[in-house]
Each structure stands twice: as structure tokens, then as C-alpha cells.
């Protein structure tokens, strides 16, 4: 997908990487990547969609485990490209369903998500320096802190 998108001629492309060690997961159906968003974990009885991008997907999966132990069933959605997702209305409507509480986890500025849901956990200030793990804790991006914020939203 990165190679395909980097060869676009109709607009800019950025590939954003992390310096942190991240858990990886396998995308079973590569065609789902082309839709801009896909379910990493899907339950028939989910009441919450945890929507994340990039490194936040692993955090969403950890929060899902904690919420499940509290009886809150969640789907986890990866959105590698919001622009592509917006062009796939059926997939967009499946992800941002009115049947679930949709919560976005975004370690960057949350503004681009507010037109899709008011439930956004993001960072609206910058300029901190330090180790990645310490900064994630400082900004509230640990599985436990994210889980507590999600519980307050639902």
C-alpha cells in the first residue's frame, strides 16, 4: 500500500514511521487495506468501535482486552488512510456505525476526527521531550489510562 500510494500524482503522500518498538499483527485480507480502514478485531455483539491509526492500533488492542474483562465488547479498527476510507462510503458507514459508540485513539492532533465522532482521545499540545514510553504515560496513552477514558465516554 505504501508503494502504491507513494506513486500518486494527484496530491501529496506521507509515510509516517515510529521510532518505538511496536507489536505487529497480520492483515489477513490485503484488499481490506485498499479500503482505508478495516476491522482488526470484530465481535458480533460489540457496543464500541475503537478506531486507531498506526502505532495506536496496538494500544487499542490492549484496551480491548481490558474492556472485555469488564464486560464491554469492542471492535478494533485500523484506519491507515482516512482519505481513502472517506472515498469508500460502505466501509466508512460500517466502521462509523450508529449501532456502536465510536471512539478514536489518536496520538496526534485530534481535529481531523471530530467531524466523524466527538469521542476522540488525542493530544492537542506538543513540545515535550523524553523517552517514548514516558511521554505515552504523560499524555495518557497507556492501556489502563485509555481504558478509563473510554469507560467515561460510554
Task: Briefly describe each language-model feature range.
Residues 1-3:
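Short, small-residue-biased leader/transition segments that mark boundaries at the very start
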Residues 7-154:
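Thiamine diphosphate
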Amino acid at each position: 500500500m505504501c508503494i502504491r500510494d507513494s506513486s500518486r500524482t494527484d496530491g501529496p503522500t506521507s509515510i509516517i514511521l515510529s521510532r518505538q518498538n511496536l507489536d505487529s499483527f497480520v492483515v489477513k485480507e490485503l484488499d481490506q487495506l485498499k479500503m482505508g480502514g478495516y476491522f482488526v478485531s470484530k465481535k458480533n455483539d460489540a457496543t464500541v468501535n475503537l478506531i486507531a491509526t498506526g502505532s495506536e492500533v496496538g494500544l487499542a488492542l490492549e484496551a480491548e482486552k481490558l474492556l472485555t474483562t469488564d464486560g464491554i465488547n469492542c471492535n478494533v479498527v485500523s484506519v491507515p488512510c482516512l482519505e481513502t476510507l472517506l472515498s469508500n462510503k460502505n466501509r466508512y458507514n460500517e466502521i462509523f456505525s450508529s449501532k456502536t459508540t465510536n471512539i478514536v485513539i489518536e496520538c496526534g492532533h485530534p481535529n481531523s476526527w471530530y467531524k466523524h465522532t466527538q469521542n476522540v482521545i488525542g493530544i492537542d499540545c506538543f513540545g515535550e521531550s523524553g523517552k517514548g514510553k514516558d511521554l505515552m504515560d504523560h499524555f495518557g496513552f497507556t492501556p489502563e489510562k485509555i481504558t478509563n477514558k473510554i469507560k467515561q465516554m460510554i
